[in-house]
From Swiss-Prot:
Compartments where found: Cytoplasm
Function field: An accessory protein needed during the final step in the assembly of 30S ribosomal subunit, possibly for assembly of the head region. Essential for efficient processing of 16S rRNA. May be needed both before and after RbfA during the maturation of 16S rRNA. It has affinity for free ribosomal 30S subunits but not for 70S ribosomes.
Cross-referenced PANTHER family: RIBOSOME MATURATION FACTOR RIMM (PTHR33692:SF1)
One of the Pfam families matching this protein, by short name: RimM
Species name: Lactococcus lactis subsp. cremoris (strain MG1363)
Domain spans labelled PRC barrel: 97-169
Protein name per its UniProtKB record: Ribosome maturation factor RimM
Stated family: Belongs to the RimM family.
Signal peptide (UniProt feature, chain positions): none
Any one GO molecular-function label of the UniProt entry: ribosome binding
């Protein structure tokens, strides 16, 4: 089976016409949830269910409201709450140098002055820039803003991120 990468989670229904609310987990949400996009639906046990073609999608607050082709009523989609939508690796576009997909960053080791401080476990999108959550042993999670003074180098091939933890970030 080909590789799939998570782009969002269906968190609720929207209205009565078969639309769902999706909490995105991708930098490319506008592309992923636009008309004609094909996504794969996976259940809460990560079993593939079916491919879905986006009929329409729009941003509403922190969610995307998406209608898939073939689903016309709330009863058609209600059972998919908590399910995950993913994109097939073959449908991912090539990125420019210095750009990367979330799945390439999550799990990477994080170093400050060549000292391992933890692993990236999650990427948050609170506003102007992404925030990388670093899991550390014996300490609370570290929240690193993805900005040039903090993130110095990202080596996707080596799963390594070099950072400079500025004063005040690790209090």
């Amino acid at each position: 089976m080909e590789n799939f990468y998570k782009v969002g989670t269906i968190v609720n229904t929207q209205g009565l016409q078969g639309e769902v609310r999706i909490l995105p987990s991708t930098d490319f949400a506008n592309e992923r949830f636009s008309k004609g996009a094909v996504l794969a639906l996976f259940d809460d046990k990560d079993n593939y269910i079916q491919d879905l073609k986006v009929k329409s999608g729009r941003l509403q607050k922190n969610f995307y409201v998406v209608k898939f082709e073939g689903f016309y009523h709330i009863n058609d989609v209600e059972k998919y709450k908590g399910y995950v939508v993913k994109i097939a690796q073959e449908n991912q576009e090539e990125l420019n140098d210095g750009e990367f997909y979330y799945h390439e960053i999550i799990g990477s080791d994080v170093y400050d002055n060549d000292i391992l401080i933890g692993q990236i476990s999650e990427i948050l999108q609170p506003g102007a820039n992404d925030v990388w959550v670093v899991k550390r042993k014996g300490k609370r999670d570290l929240l690193l803003p993805y900005i040039p003074p903090v993130v110095l180098k990202v080596d996707v091939a080596q799963h390594r991120v070099d950072v400079d933890i500025m004063e005040g970030l690790d209090d």
